[in-house]
A protein has these predicted regions:
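Sec-dependent bacterial lipoprotein signal peptides
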Residues: 1-15
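OB-fold and OB-like single-stranded nucleic-acid-recognition modules
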Residues: 17-177
């Protein structure tokens, strides 16, 4: 009897340790901080797949603003760019992408100033939407400086709290349609 109870306890412990949480795209924005290092399943429509590497996918819910950033895991092939608009079911661990505070912005700003204006620097609009910032079209200002300014405004709106961005490190996915 003791062996049976021990076996049941061991199985329950293993199952609870490997718990996978299902979250919607909208829930991810508010729950990601509590889910760091945990495995999640997120289902959403591929709004954009990075055109440079194909290793970054942005999931959305049609008609909603929220986005979830998904990176391919180690050893995975890039996402297929022709699947933009398809529904993905992604499994992976939640991780912190970056913590943006005043020190981070000061360092970034110094790097931009030292490197000079970068003609033709492209800022991915989808990435900015995922970060929750809105860049105003200003052709006279360096796009990176616009981005820094927008982050400072967002930090001020948050009462000085840093901006923490999260992503899902994909371990597997399926395309549903």
């Amino acid at each position: 009897m003791k062996k049976i109870l021990l076996a049941i306890f061991t199985i329950l412990l293993m199952v609870s340790c490997n718990k996978t949480t299902v979250v919607s795209v909208e829930e991810f924005a508010t729950k990601a901080g509590d889910l760091v290092d945990q495995t999640v399943i997120v289902e959403g429509v591929a709004k954009h797949i990075c055109s440079n590497s194909g290793r970054k996918l942005f999931l959305s819910t049609p008609g909603k603003e929220q986005l979830v950033t998904v990176f391919t895991g180690e050893g995975m092939e890039p996402f297929d760019r022709t699947t933009t608009g398809k529904t993905y079911k992604v499994t992976g661990k939640v991780a912190i992408t970056v913590t943006i505070d005043e020190a981070y912005l000061n360092e970034w700003e110094q790097e931009v100033r030292e490197s000079g204006l970068k003609e033709g620097t492209h800022i991915c609009e989808t990435e900015q939407q995922a970060a929750g910032i809105d860049l105003k079209e200003n052709l006279d200002e360096n796009p990176q400086m616009q981005q820094i300014k927008a982050y400072r405004e967002k930090i001020a709106q948050n009462g000085g709290k840093p901006i923490v961005q999260y992503h899902v490190e994909c371990s597997e996915y399926e395309i549903i349609n």
